[in-house]
Amino acid sequence: MPLTLILCYGFVIILTALGCIFLALAFTDSTALLIKIWQFEPLHFEIALRIDSFANICALSICWIGALIFLYSSSYLKSYSRRISVICMLGLFAFSMLLTVLADNLILVFIAWELTSIFSYALISTEREKPEVRMAALSSLLITAGGGLGLLILAILSITFFGAASFSELEFYKDQIIAHPWSHTLLLLASFAAFSKSAQFPFSSWLPRAMAAPSPVSAYLHSATMVTLGVYLLVRLFPIFGSMELWTILLCTIGGLSFLVAGIRAFIAEKIKTILAHTTVSALGLMVLMLGIGSPYSVKAALVFYIVHALYKSSLFMLAGDFAKFQKSNTLQKLEEVDNFSFSSKLACILALAAMVGLPPLLAFISKELLIEATLNSKSALLLTALLIIANGFVTACALTIGWSILKPKKKKRKKHSLSPVSNFSLLTFPALILGILGIIFGVLAQEITEPILAEAYFNLIASDKELDLKLWHGFNFAFAVSTATLVFAAFLAIYRKSITKLKIILSLEELFLNGQKYFDFVVYRFSALCKIATSYFQTGKLTDYLVLNFIALACVLAVGAVTHSNFDMKNIIFPSEALLIGALLIIAGSVIILNSDSRAGGILSLALVGLGTTVVFVCSSAIDLALTQILVETLTLVIFVFIAIKVPKKYFSIGASSSAVSHFIALLIGASFAFLHMMALRSQESTEISEYYLTQSIPQAFGGNVVNVILVDFRSFDTFGEVLVLCIAALGVLALIRIIPQHKGNL
């Protein structure tokens, strides 16, 4: 069996088995399961998995949709040159996604969050020979990974202010967080991370570009998993920030804008995958809008729509890949020319598009009714209902247009595309068909299957025992009338699509407001130009300039840190003893002689004087072992310099720039800053858990009384080994350079 099939089927088995476990947990009435694996208390870092109701829903979609994607990939990637790397990256991405939704510790969530961005970058750039693919991958990485920094800062601030390093601890400190002066800042940081990950306005430009990735990648990452992480984060934080006014304003504004703008962009687009990308952004905006409303109706609608969108969008992306690769139909116009779709392709496409429209008896119909009910029962019912009709009308029009392009009778004059035999292979349509059938099952058996899965998550979010009450049919009510009006509006848009897309107002909106890619490219270009200017200014090629800049920056940092110390007082400064002053004077004298010496011998002996002063300092500090080591090092260095000095030109010891007033000032500044900070640190030195651990455990665990040596050779032996290894590699590198450099007489 080929390695491709072994990998694909292996991931199918693993993800299916994990999905069955999460499904079993979803049907149990148990509370959240917390599995602690390892923790490092000083940094508030803990590897712990929190498997609760909402984590079950997310993990279930990741596992089972992922299994179907790998099944689809086994056929789609058969002739792909980099299929092994794509499949392995997809597998790593799947497990990083699982870690993200199951992790409880905020720092662990951040690590997994950024891993998904890195794997997404690698998967998008599989065809890295193309410039547009590289730009798409870079756009994805910069926006999503950059947004993840907001999550990191949120974690740091929550640990600093409240000692809360996990979602469960944040919920415990809910009242303190809301009353804290930095509560709005924490919410803005979380929103920044969520909006960038879920491609919300104004960070939505990366997702349409990511369609440069192969279809299995788009079907998995950009429909049901990675792009929903932002929504996942908002759901996790809903019990904490959901009652804040800023939450409602921010999420309703950004979600509503994304919902509408992306819907219009999808309606204008011609490429199938681009249409699906924009409708994904629109759907994510709708979820954010529902969470922003924050009512029990909207939370229920968001949870149900989360499942609906994952089912139909991943199915459509798989079918779009089939059409583009094997039918050569990646645009609406080319799709209209294909006349011989297989029955399974047509059926899968009809089911997916019906879910996108929201037709009965699919779960999507229940979801649409809930969305309308949520807007009708909101505070701004008229505005939000109008927004829902207009934005959803554009998205529904896209579904009707794609469906009509596939199903409408073909004109005989048109050239028919021959259907590749590979595209009839069932594994290309079977996964999409399964997802469509699941949409029907979840709709028809909503109260028997869907409601038990979602009920506990719903209760936890709204903190109430209100029934979920998922019914397929609620009768002819006002919500049904709004749904009908939306469908009529969408049909009108689909019929007159070509005329509407040519209107000047649509074109001007696309040019000025909707095209975020141009603004992103502008920012990246200007930033690159700024970096070039900075590089040309700072990277002069002179070592003296580099040393000056680094020393000035270091001195400023040290000086500011010392002066702004909370307990700053001249009384806190501990001055050195007389013996230490002798060592310091030897070091200073040797340094001054080196700077002013014009002979090789004088410079070398002065350098030895500096080493002698350092040895005196070690002896005065009762560090005899360090003093002995220093003597050995200085002796060896002195011998080496004596041999090298014969070939060193005399001009190397000339005074030059090193004795200038600027150099002297910088040297004094950096020395004074180091000395001042060191004396302050000695005064304010506090015992930590780490230092106490080394002091108490050096004898019982490492059988050594010299704590410094024990740390180097026992507790941190791998660090020491790594340092030794680095020095050996550096020595080998220097030896290689010496051998390849032409030897000139009299010069080294």
Feature map (PLM): residue ranges:
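Membrane-interface and transmembrane segments of multi-pass membrane proteins
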Residues: S423-V557, I670, E686-S698
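Membrane-helix interface motif
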Residues: A24-I35, L157-S168, G358-L371, V444-A463, ...
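Flexible extramembrane loops and terminal tails that flank transmembrane helices
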Residues: V563, I574-G583, A589-L595, P649-L748
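Alpha-helical transmembrane segments and their helix-start/interface "positive-inside/aromatic belt" motifs
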Residues: P2-I14, A136-A145, N340-C349, V422-I437, ...
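Hydrophobic alpha-helical membrane-insertion segments
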Residues: G10-A24, G147-I156, I350-V357, P431-I449, ...
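Transmembrane helix-loop-helix hairpins at membrane boundaries of multipass inner-membrane proteins
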Residues: M1-C88, T160-A179, S205, R236-F238, ...
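Hydrophobic transmembrane alpha-helices and their helix-loop junctions in integral membrane proteins
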Residues: L68-V109, F119-K415, L419-N424, V560, ...
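Short aromatic-rich membrane-water interface segments that cap or initiate transmembrane helices
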Residues: Q39-I57, K174-L187, A374-A386, E467-G475, ...
